UniProtKB/Swiss-Prot annotation:
Belongs to the orthopoxvirus OPG058 family. The chain crosses the membrane at residues 2-22. This is Protein OPG059. It is a single-pass type II membrane protein. GO terms for cellular component: host cell membrane; membrane; virion membrane. The lineage of its organism: Viruses, Varidnaviria, Bamfordvirae, Nucleocytoviricota, Pokkesviricetes.
Amino acid sequence: MVIGLVIFVSVAAAIVGVLSNVLDMLMYVEENNEEDARIKEEQELLLLY
């Protein structure tokens, strides 16, 4: 009984850890895309002058 509970808790913790890592990756990629778009806009503006 106790062993089953320990296994369940460890599996749940692993799933939560993986999900949080995936969310962090998605947010990091989104931030990078926004920065890249901003840099491209700045470069285009500089080319216009």
